[in-house]
């Protein structure tokens, strides 16, 4: 998972029986009653077969976001500590330096000798981190091909529980490795941490929880409420990351990596137990059995169904818009994956930050966009009063915020300028929920799972390229200008802005049809 849980949060599966009418078809009668002829893709319309339209909401339906918050708390509580342990054990076990010397890395006790060792160790540690990212990508990418269909057939809750179990096992194994390193003065190879990723990878990583979570939201919410619920989901991610980052540095200074990893494991297994007891299934059994017959769950039929859904022609400019918005989401995931693989190392080599200083920065960096994200509901409400493109506006503003923040990081010469970059990135949390909402509104309910499954696969595969590329850029510029990768990130966000501009242009050519989608 990335600090962007980013990343990870990307998939919506169908919540409608296959025997029911397609929403765009079922609403033909209401279309004829409108003088404008607007499509029934309108977000405020509910259709037969949608679970949220046919049964009352229970309080358990609102427990999803707290569980996601706990997962992201546990993840970020250990994230920076894990990176630091990889560097420390690369120094001791990888290069054979004494424990007393390696303990000084990443502290304020900087000498010419420790700076030389840091520059020698970092490329090696970057390779270990890259290997971990690659292992985390391969199997989840394969699982993602079928995640939408599995979620449609077996329900959302089993996928959520699988993902939580994977993360819990990762931190349990990491705690065991850190415990051994603690009692051998670091003489445990950092490559053992790659082993901790294997159970997480086999159980789907962030792909499965993203599938299940956003499918769950699509099942239990509809109309304009869906965009608000998407923001609440994104906010839960940011608050979880914030709390994890806030406590991580202090816990690490007071204890050690073994305790930090153990706390993360306990939090996730506790959430898993409560989820099994309290979280209801959002997709009724009757919908699951009728929407995806058992005979259609074979690998071949799933792949055929996925391909036919993703490649079929669509009315107006829907296929172009879907593809373009998906590319924007892929660009943001690409930058997040790549940047996060080297950013902590960049801050250590450029400004000599400690773990505590970095986690304090992370706390502020998460808090500011989280507050802006919580205000996203107010922004949407206000924009809907004065424009018919509120969702598209917010996505564009968010990408501009990303771009300016990356440029500031790239050209920063002092530590305080990194905090200025946080202010420039105040709206960066809004692009994902806004793009997901646009895609959801463009699709009928029985196609969301497959379209977003494809997106999830591509996002899961993106670290194969992004992490490799960013590590290569960072190691090549380590001794000259290590922050140049931030400028590359700004360039990619600029491409995203141009792509959303083309969506705006296409939308303006058919306002009657597309206003309900982007409002």
UniProtKB/Swiss-Prot annotation:
It catalyses: N-acetyl-beta-D-glucosaminyl-(1->4)-1,6-anhydro-N-acetyl-beta-D-muramoyl-L-alanyl-gamma-D-glutamyl-meso-2,6-diaminopimeloyl-D-alanine(out) + n H(+)(out) = N-acetyl-beta-D-glucosaminyl-(1->4)-1,6-anhydro-N-acetyl-beta-D-muramoyl-L-alanyl-gamma-D-glutamyl-meso-2,6-diaminopimeloyl-D-alanine(in) + n H(+)(in). GO terms for biological process: innate immune response; peptidoglycan transport; positive regulation of antimicrobial humoral response; positive regulation of peptidoglycan recognition protein signaling pathway; transmembrane transport. Residues 1-51 are annotated as: Disordered. InterPro entries: MFS (IPR011701), MFS_trans_sf (IPR036259). It holds the Pfam family MFS_1. Expressed in Malpighian tubules. Keywords: Cytoplasmic vesicle, Immunity, Innate immunity, Membrane, Transmembrane, Transmembrane helix, Transport. GO terms for cellular component: membrane; phagocytic vesicle membrane. The chain crosses the membrane at residues 58-78, 128-148, 159-179, 197-217, 230-250, 259-279, 320-340, 363-383, 390-408, 451-471, 484-504. It is found in: Cytoplasmic vesicle, Phagosome membrane. The keyword Transmembrane applies. It is a multi-pass membrane protein. GO terms for molecular function: peptidoglycan transmembrane transporter activity; transmembrane transporter activity. PROSITE patterns: FAD_G3PDH_2. Residues 27-38 have a biased composition (Polar residues). Putative proton-coupled transporter that delivers pathogen-associated molecular patterns to cytosolic pattern recognition receptors as part of the innate immune response to microbes. Likely transports anhydro-muropeptides that contain the amino acid diaminopimelic acid (DAP-type peptidoglycan muropeptides) such as tracheal toxin (TCT), common in Gram-negative bacteria. May transport TCT across the phagosome membrane for cytosolic recognition by PGRP-LE, triggering the activation of imd/Relish pathway and production of antimicrobial peptides. Belongs to the major facilitator superfamily. SLC46 family. This is Probable peptidoglycan muropeptide transporter SLC46. The gene is SLC46.
């Amino acid at each position: 998972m990335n600090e962007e849980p980013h990343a990870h949060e990307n998939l919506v599966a169908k919540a409608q029986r296959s025997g029911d009418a397609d929403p765009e078809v079922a609403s033909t009668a209401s279309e004829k009653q409108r003088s404008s002829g607007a499509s029934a893709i309108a977000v405020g319309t509910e259709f037969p077969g949608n679970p949220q339209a046919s049964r009352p909401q229970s309080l358990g339906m609102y427990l999803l976001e707290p569980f996601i918050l706990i997962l992201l708390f546990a993840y970020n509580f250990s994230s920076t500590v894990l990176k630091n342990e990889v560097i420390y054990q690369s120094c001791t076990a990888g290069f054979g330096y004494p424990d007393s010397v390696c303990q000084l890395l990443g502290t304020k006790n900087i000498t010419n000798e420790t700076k030389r060792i840091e520059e020698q160790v970092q490329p090696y540690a970057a390779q270990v981190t890259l290997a971990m990212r690659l292992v985390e990508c391969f199997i989840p990418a394969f699982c993602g091909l079928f995640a939408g269909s599995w979620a449609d057939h077996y329900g959302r809750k089993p996928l959520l529980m699988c993902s939580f179990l994977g993360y819990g096992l990762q931190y349990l194994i990491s705690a065991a490795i850190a415990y051994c390193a603690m009692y051998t003065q670091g003489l445990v190879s950092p490559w053992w941490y790659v082993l901790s990723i294997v159970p997480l990878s086999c159980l789907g990583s962030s792909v499965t929880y993203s599938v299940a979570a956003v499918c769950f939201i699509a099942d239990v919410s509809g109309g304009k409420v869906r965009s608000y619920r998407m923001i609440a989901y994104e906010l839960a991610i940011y608050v979880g990351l914030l709390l994890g980052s806030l406590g991580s540095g202090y816990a690490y200074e007071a204890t050690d990596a073994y305790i930090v990893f153990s706390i993360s494991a306990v939090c996730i297994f506790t959430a898993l137990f409560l989820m099994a007891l309290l979280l209801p299934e959002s997709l009724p059994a009757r919908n699951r059995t009728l929407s995806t017959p058992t005979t259609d769950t074979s690998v071949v039929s799933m792949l055929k169904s996925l391909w036919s859904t993703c490649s079929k022609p669509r009315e107006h400019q829907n296929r172009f818009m879907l593809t373009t918005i998906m590319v924007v989401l892929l660009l943001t995931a690409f930058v997040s994956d790549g940047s996060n693989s080297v950013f902590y190392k960049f801050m250590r080599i450029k400004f000599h930050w400690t773990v505590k200083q970095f986690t304090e920065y992370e706390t502020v960096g998460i808090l500011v966009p989280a507050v802006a994200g919580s205000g996203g509901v107010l922004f949407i409400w206000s924009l809907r009063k004065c424009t018919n493109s509120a969702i598209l506006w917010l996505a564009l503003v968010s990408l501009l915020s990303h771009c300016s923040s990356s440029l500031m990081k790239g050209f920063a010469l002092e530590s305080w300028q990194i905090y200025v970059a946080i202010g420039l990135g105040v709206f960066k949390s809004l692009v994902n929920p806004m793009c997901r909402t646009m895609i959801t509104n463009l699709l009928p309910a029985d196609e969301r799972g497959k379209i977003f499954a494809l997106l999830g696969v591509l996002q899961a595969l993106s670290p194969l390229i992004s992490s490799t590329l960013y590590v290569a850029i960072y190691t090549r510029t380590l001794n000259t200008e290590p922050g140049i990768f931030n400028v590359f990130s700004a360039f990619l966000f600029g491409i995203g802005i141009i792509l959303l501009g083309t969506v705006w242009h296409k939308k303006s050519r058919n306002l009657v049809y597309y206003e309900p989608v982007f409002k």
